[in-house]
Amino acid sequence: MEKYYLAVDIGASSGRHILGRLENGKIELEEIYRFENGMDHKDGKLLWDVNRLFGEIVAGMKKCKELGKIPVSMAIDTWAVDYVLLDEKDQILGDTYGYRDHRTDGMDAEVAKILPETELYGKTGIQKQIFNTVYQLMAVKQQTPEFLQQAKTLLMLPDYFGFRLTGNKLSEYTNGSTTQLVNPDTFQWDKELIRKLGYPEDIFLPLQMPGTKVGQLLPEIQKEVGFDLEVVLCGSHDTASAVMAVPQTEGDGIYISSGTWSLMGIESLKPVITEDAAAANFTNEGGYDHRFRFLKNIMGLWMIQSVRHEYNDAYSFAQLCDMAEESKEFPSRVDVNDQSFLSPDSMVEAIRQYCHKTGQPVPESVGELTSVVYRILAQSYGETVRGLEKIAGKTYDSIHIIGGGSNAAYLNQLTADATGKTVYAGPGEATAIGNLLAQMIHAGDLADLKSARKCVRESFEIKTFAPAK
């Protein structure tokens, strides 16, 4: 009888159900269900339809029954920072806002009136981003204070879905850490900070580590999907799950979780909370088994995704890589952090205008456009590596690139050249794999994180890129 585990991995633009099993000591993956996701525009607000998302979770579970592949457990990961407030009857209070909604505009100034930004970073080790939950809750306090008064529980979105499946409310640590309300020394909510900000402290449940059992399915869910299983906590912040799947078996290395955004950093047993780290905008997010993900959020592949989209998705990412390499002599450079690239109506025009404005040759072909972007991305990776090593006080000899961007061979080679380090690329499905690893360790099928990573290295193709001499 084959033993299946189910990873439900929900990103901001799509979600999928992936079944995993161990076959001769190797992890086998099978995607069985996929669905669209996105924030809904409603009355000028950007909202998540959590009922629809929960319906998709259940629909994917039914697919397991159809296929005759019943998992022993499941875990859910999503993006960070978004949450629901539940009343005494466990109903959601108000709307479920998406992190891109503008209600947090100016909320950093409101929080800073109570607590300076340097003090907030010193307490939590989390980089300031205007969509962090700490600012979202300040928006609630300012705009709809009655919701905070009526709230009995705050649950991050994956924890809310776990509650809907099992009837049990648990709060998971890695995603909790992204709220900017967690004490990195205790791995629990910073109740003093929460009180100081005027948020009700009793709505925050004790934080639990990945690998904790949430519960069995509620009878009505069992009836609907046709089976029972155990719901388990994974690193429910998707990046925490992805970093679990970094196939680093010994020594220290830098990782890049490469997708729409690139998250570049190291794993540490202690948070790095210094003035230099704060100035360079590095964050200390929670990781598996009391680890920290000391990382920086940098522009990822979304400039490439935008260019591809403007050409009606006519080229695959592999083709774009090849075309960029063919145009590698094209000399122009752009600054990826320039405001003009944040959300332009046309990324192609934004790149061309930047080159024109700065007196450089203007890229015309797709290859020239993508060449400009890939090289500047590699350059920003190089700068981030140098900053990271300076702050950490040590050098690293390798970089592991995981996630969808690990398939961009040309970018991987440019990254090796720009950093002077050996690059190991893969696996591409890192988030779902990390989700499954937490379940497999919980079940005793894998001994610990070290053996889980060894298993990843042996299960998936990892490509090596050496820096040019």
Where are these regions (language model features)?
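N-terminal glycine/serine-rich phosphate-binding loop of ATP-dependent small-molecule kinases
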Residues: 1-94, 122, 222-231, 419-421, ...
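Pocket-flanking alpha-helical
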Residues: 84, 106-110, 242-244
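Short glycine-rich phosphate-binding loop at a beta-alpha junction
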Residues: 70-78, 153, 206, 394-403
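Short, basic and Ser/Thr-rich N-terminal targeting/leader segments
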Residues: 11-13, 72, 77-79, 133, ...
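Carbohydrate-associated surface elements
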Residues: 101
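A conserved helix-loop-beta module that forms one wall/lid of the active-site cleft
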Residues: 191, 197-212, 436
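Active-site core segments that coordinate phosphate-bearing ligands/cofactors
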Residues: 2, 6-7, 19, 112-125, ...
